């Protein structure tokens, strides 16, 4: 099994496929829930429309392109791919250094945490251990080939609620 958490653009994916095609049991591509369009309804299901508009970030557009390539490849050649769309991941050994730490540092220093808009945007976060468990369940499971899964926590937070929860963990009033 190859868990590819490093491919961001089509060239990355095509390079791996060229090397591994015919010699791999399972390729799991790490995508992102950022590929979806805006929604006031949570949870977002895997068949929710993708956002390919000009408002989508380059990162999101590139993930959509990679997903389409891999799903087309699966349909044409049965390439054993599963797409895992992650939301924000938190926990130890996070590969995005300082994601949570920046906010915790601001809270601990009594500095304002900047929240976009009114802080009412809803989202989900997933703990790295839970998301790793989901990947293990997918590994070498033929029922997951050609499928897309949202991998995230079960709880929803507003941006403001997320900051408040972090402040509560620290025992401070933001």
Q: Language-model features: where?
A:
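Short-chain dehydrogenase/reductase
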Residues: 42-68, 97-101, 124-125, 156, ...
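A short C-terminal helix-loop "cap" of Rossmann-like NAD(P)-dependent dehydrogenase/epimerase domains
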Residues: 49, 104-116, 172-174
